[in-house]
From Swiss-Prot:
It is found in: Cell membrane. GO terms for biological process: potassium ion transport. Disulfide bonds: none annotated. Belongs to the AAE transporter (TC 2.A.81) family. This is Uncharacterized transporter BB2657. NCBIfam families: YidE_YbjL_dupl. InterPro entries: AAE_transporter, RCK_C, RCK_C_sf, YidE_YbjL. The chain crosses the membrane at residues 4-26, 33-55, 68-90, 97-119, 162-184, 389-411, 415-432, 453-472, 482-504, 539-561. Residues 210-295, 296-379 form the RCK C-terminal domain. Gene3D superfamilies: Regulator of K+ conductance, C-terminal domain (3.30.70.1450). It comes from Bordetella bronchiseptica (strain ATCC BAA-588 / NCTC 13252 / RB50). GO terms for cellular component: plasma membrane.
Amino acid sequence: MQAFVQFLGSNPYILLFLTIGLAVWVGKFSIKGYGLGAVAAAIVVGCLVATVGAAYGVKFHLDEFAKSLLYYLFMYGVGLRVGPSFVNALNKESINYAILAIIAPILGLAIVVLGTQFFGLPLGAAGGMLAGSQTMSAAIGSAEQAVSAGVLSLGSESPEQISAMIALSYGITYIWGTVGIILLCKYLPRIWGVDAKAAALEFEKAHGVPNVDDAGLTAFHPFDLRAYRVENPESIGKTVQQFRTRFPQYQVVNVERGDQLLGPSAETVLQQGDVVALGGRLEEMTANMGVLGPEVPDARALNIPLDQAEILVTNKEVTGRPLKTFRGSELAGQIQLQRVERSGVPLPIGLETTLQKRDVLFVTGLQPAVSKAGEIFGVIARHSSATDLLTLSFGMILGFLIGLIEVPAFGAKVGLGNAGGLLLSGIIVSSISSRLRFFGNTPNAARNILEDLGLIGFVAIVGINAGADLLTQLTGAIALKIFIVGFLASTIPPIIVWAIGFHIMKINPALLMGATAGARSHSGPAREAAKEVGSSVPWLGFPVGYAVSGVLLTVFGYFAMVLAH
């Protein structure tokens, strides 16, 4: 064992990725659905590895440059993810959710700062408690930035000791921070005496929102494509345009005459024996089965090339409109809306689902219809797995330049720093690229690498570097005080957010369950809330708060450190 520990001490890259791998493995374990997750496991595993090393006389220490670089990549990735929704939060439809997402982080920060001062907790505790109680691991990074930026008076304590206290406080408060918000989002309606299931059902009926979580894979398709042989005298001799005028609910997508495929030209005259591929809603297809003639299994006529695309909603004329207003459009029967995403979060698709700018529509249909849909709704973004590294590089440079900007305030110079600058530049780049879609492509998988590897790697290094000093910081009295402050910071803000949303903003309780989860930037409670009410409605209240609170909580680790001392 001694030789293995010394080997790790001599090979820091192996040490780092061993810690990351073990953290991901440990993070997969759960008890009744509750587990640490990879990020929390990274700091636990990192501290454990460092403690084992110290027991054998080897003090592990990984490079500060690598730690900072990983964190900066993560911050830029966060900006890319939340950018469009963060901008969307400024519109009037989303303002209530944005307000709730501002209230919760501020309350959490205030409780942590006051609790630290009341109990006289050591440096580093405030940053760790904020990160753990709000389950925002990224706040560890901004807390560390407060130490490295030199804005704190360290006194006799070393940066390693402060990092150890950040890690310790995070670990003590994280478990209740995770479990508590899930329990609150599930049971706050019951505490208030509200039937959230009935509220969700009422919203579904009023807005046509299906329970997509339970939909699964079914054989039902609302749109259909069938082939008919022209034998009805009323249709023989009519042009395709005349047929469309008489039956606007159908779309002629192909005409086969003998060995020729004539396509859906409006001027084509239908002749006896032609085979017409007809598209439309299923109920319409079965209502007038003899309008052309008998149905035939003509594979050649039905062999219609289909297209798939992601359409970014940018057209002002369609934003704010519910989906039901498009039912009678020329696209009916030619495209199928498979999914709607807002800030990367899938939304339930219902007749009253209202489109917002920068929503992404995933459609499948006839090639001309998909192109037409792109013109109507905004911009077609063809799927690409290639990452625009040029934009990524210049986006990172922009972030570092923003971080250099400092303004005089309160007798000192204040700026966003590198981390804040990268977060802001990520928001700017993703907001612009989501509008144009001609540059800056960063597929979800690539962005996930920036976020996951960046944060897990950063937290692992924090744990490794702090672990040797961890045991010297730990006493029963300090641990109890940290837990109390973390418990209050995790529990009080969601209750106040719920009360404001329910009594003042009059938000539907099912939506408010998701909004409360979003205000804590945690998807787990929204998922559990959806299960609790048996509906997807809570997800509709989630995306805006998730984006806003995610940005605030990420940077509040810095302010917790500064304000608490």
